[in-house]
Amino acid sequence: MAVRGYVLIEAEVGKAKAVGEAVRKLSHSDAKVVAVDTVTGPFDVIVQMEADDLDKLGNCITDGIQRVEGVQRTTTCLSVRLG
């Protein structure tokens, strides 16, 4: 079963647009970027991702998203099926 996660990104001041564009262009063999949105509020960019397993999702976040220039901090929320 695929793992779906939402990566909430805090960007450096004035860098949200550039971070969103860079993340949109990321190519990683372990996971797929499904959607990237710049948003208002405590986070600047929200990324929806899918991977075959949790390790692959984590690798894409640490090797890809967290290395994008302008990314200060990430918080990852995993999608779960309840009930």
Model-derived regions: residue spans:
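A compositional/biophysical signature of low hydrophobicity enriched in polar/charged and small residues
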Residues: 1-83
